Amino acid sequence: MKGYVWSVVNVMTGDRFFFYEHGSRSTRVAMGLLKDFTGAIQSDGYIVYEHFEGMEGKKLLGCWAHARRRFFEAKVENEKLALEALSYIRRLYDVEAEADALDAADNKPDHERRKALRQEKAYPEIKKFETWMEASILKCPPKSLMEEAISYTYKILKKLSLYVTDGRYKIDNNMVENSIKPLAIGRKNYLFCGDDDAAQRAAVVYSLLATCKAHGVNERAWLEDALRRIPEYEQAGKDYADLLPANWRALSAK
């Protein structure tokens, strides 16, 4: 039986977790995961996320990487228009590269500077791209790859544009995409989890190991030390949160 694992990443802290509930990819699961969350939610165009649109305390952001992928796939059908679209999107990423370079030079992120750069250089390109899409879709056969790429991007352009309003937001959700790779590799190696309980346990283990990586913690060192400390924590009634990867570095330094 095919099932789905959800991946959630906190872009500010790097913390991430994987969630499995009977393999479901339904609206009910998404709502259960994020109903109490307040802030920005960035995702692909999966229709389930539309239910968060307009909800109090939630802002839904689009992913430029997913939009770019659709135009890249449309190259086989209409290379000229695809390359034109990709050039607009590339210029948005050029602005991100400029902001990254400035942050690297300062050895710290400057979210206000990134926001200013985006509004000065990226947002005008988005508006030009919007005009281009309005004209170019008239040249595309219905249901063609290019027509679908333009329709998809144009429909969510407001969500795609929101990243320019806050320097903390990402241009895409590649952090989530990258976090999924270990699961994909594991699936190829061991093929399946066996049952729902095993899949749920696997999601917990992947969550902990991915968070180790995000915080620069050696996964094996953390696992060996945490397992050794668990009986002590259980006996003393200590808070297990101390053993989470994000907190463990300070604990292990004592």
Q: What is each stretch, according to the model?
A:
Residues 1-254:
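Catalytic center-proximal scaffold of phosphoryl-transfer enzymes
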